[in-house]
Amino acid sequence: FILNTHHHFDHVGGNAELKKKYSSKILGFEKDKNRIPSIDVLLKDDQEFRIGNLNFRTIFIPGHTLGHIAFYLEKEKIVFTGDTLFSLGCGRIFEGTYQQMFDSLNKIKSLPGDTEIYCGHEYTNNNLEFCLKFNPNNNYLKEKEKIIKAKIKEKKPTIPTTIKEEIQTNIFLRYDDLDVKSTLNLKNA
């Protein structure tokens, strides 16, 4: 099985070749049926499905694209967020609106804190620098910086992260934090 979070080529470009080589089924959101190559299974929002002994649930999270979904495994406490939420960042808005992205980030933010996040790209170090610029007094972020730098030095991945860590450190989930608002001159927003 190949699960597609959205239609961008860097995520679906190998679908046909992988499908042919491994006789895989391609799964994706129904709204992207004409944009995900070789799609076999059209998924709906909040749809549950099973692969082997794993139970998945889709979460519709538009913003980065209009047909973006996440794959959530509640029992395993794992979510695949594609390009909507990254470690210490979020994806660019290509097709959706800022309100859609805001709502989608809040959907992800509402998952249990110990849920592991597997995102579509490894931008952690760049995102760290960005977050430190706008949230320099965040002690959780300073601690996470040490962990990230150590992992990079040891050539280890910085993914996964968790919902709890992202709520504490990711400025895109800390929009209501007074320190972040102050740095952005948005105290009254």
Task: Label the model's feature ranges.
Residues I36-L132:
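Catalytic core of the metallo-beta-lactamase
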Residues F1-T58, I147:
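Active-site HxH/HxHxD metal-binding segment of metal-dependent hydrolases
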Residues K19-K21, T97-Y98, N135-P136:
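Glycine-rich, phosphate-binding/catalytic loops in enzymes
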Residues N4, K31, G120, T124, ...:
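Proline- and acidic/polar-enriched loop/turn elements at helix boundaries
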Residues V12-N15, I39, D45-D46, G52, ...:
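Surface-exposed loop/turn and secondary-structure junction residues enriched for glycine/proline
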Residues F29, T65, T162:
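Residue-level signal for threonine
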Residues N106-E116, N125-A189:
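Accessory terminal helices/loops
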